[in-house]
From Swiss-Prot:
PROSITE patterns: ATPASE_A
Organism from which the protein derives: Tolumonas auensis (strain DSM 9187 / NBRC 110442 / TA 4)
Intracellular or extracellular location(s): Cell inner membrane
Sequence similarity: Belongs to the ATPase A chain family.
Family matches, as InterPro entries: ATP_syn_F0_a_bact/chloroplast (IPR045082), ATP_synth_F0_asu (IPR000568), ATP_synth_F0_asu_AS (IPR023011), F0_ATP_A_sf (IPR035908)
Protein name per Swiss-Prot or TrEMBL: ATP synthase subunit a
Keyword line: ATP synthesis, Cell inner membrane, Cell membrane, CF(0), Hydrogen ion transport, Ion transport, Membrane, Transmembrane, Transmembrane helix, Transport
Keyword hit for Cell inner membrane: yes
Topology within the bilayer: Multi-pass membrane protein
A Gene Ontology term for the protein's cellular component: proton-transporting ATP synthase complex
Function, in words: Key component of the proton channel; it plays a direct role in the translocation of protons across the membrane.
Pfam families: ATP-synt_A (PF00119)
GO BP of this protein: proton motive force-driven plasma membrane ATP synthesis
Transmembrane segments: 29-49, 89-109, 132-154, 209-229, 230-250
């Protein structure tokens, strides 16, 4: 698929579908498509859940209200099972992370050529529709979690307690301060990196498989592989949203523990 209508080779087709709609260059490059889709999906989440909350009834609930209540209950039970402190932010944060990431992941279930083709009709040459397959998005979300970890670590333990945790753990002796600081710093920094890269890697791989199926097989045979993979991928997109949420809760629970 190309804007001029010529037939692309498999290699060109794959490269085209992996190219973002971008502005800027170098370090300051911004992936417009990832930004737009993530904001739109986040807005959709807020609008939908607020609409259900406003129209919620104590009588016989509708299907949408039942679904939202199930999601609320699932996230709330997960938070209570992991986070044992008292913090009004954790449950709403966990709900936002789970639903938002799930919606971004679910974009991978759309037909691979549908939205990019509509974009080309509108003279938009490139379009990637899965925000969570963009490492900039996943690492940005993980960085937000990292700042919360630092904030609550300092708030609960104080600056002195936080520094002591970095310098006196795991070896509680002044002679091991450099080793402790190195180990704890690596551990602390690895949390957001692993959190973001795990989500990115799984979603990028899933997107790549759909692209490879579309690029390598004739259209009439793609369904034989696309449908089974899409069904299996539903589990992946849900599981990755759940893992990101759970690890966020675990990290914040550790940050809020007093020593």
């Amino acid at each position: 698929m190309a804007s001029t209508g010529e037939t692309l080779t498999s290699q060109e087709y794959i490269a085209h579908h992996l190219h973002h709609l971008q502005v800027g260059s170098g370090f300051w490059t911004v992936n417009i498509d990832s930004m737009v889709f993530s904001v739109v999906l986040g807005t959709l989440f807020i609008w939908l859940f607020r609409r259900v909350a406003v129209k919620a009834t104590s009588g016989v609930p509708g299907k949408l209200q039942c679904f939202v209540e199930i999601v609320f209950g699932f996230v709330d039970d997960t938070v209570k099972g992991i986070f044992h402190g008292k913090n009004k932010l954790i449950a709403p944060l966990a709900l936002t992370i789970f639903v938002w990431i799930f919606l971004m992941n679910a974009m991978d279930l759309l037909p691979i050529d549908y939205l990019p083709h509509l974009a080309q009709i509108s003279n938009i040459p490139y379009l990637r529709v899965v925000p969570s397959a963009d490492v900039n998005i996943t690492l940005s979300m993980a960085l937000g979690v990292f700042f919360l970890i630092l904030f609550y670590s300092i708030k609960i333990k104080g600056i002195g307690g936080f520094v002591k945790e970095l310098t006196m753990t795991p070896f509680n002796h002044w002679a091991f301060v450099p080793i402790n600081l190195l180990l704890e710093t690596v551990t602390l920094i690895s949390k957001p990196i692993s959190l973001g890269l795990r989500l990115f890697g799984n979603m990028y791989a899933g997107e790549m498989i759909f692209i490879l199926i579309a690029a390598m097989l004739p259209w009439w045979s793609q369904w034989f592989l696309n449908v089974p993979w899409a069904i299996f991928h539903i589990l992946i997109i849900t599981l990755q949203a759940f893992i990101f949420m759970v690890l966020t809760i675990v990290y914040l629970s550790m940050a809020c523990e007093e020593h």
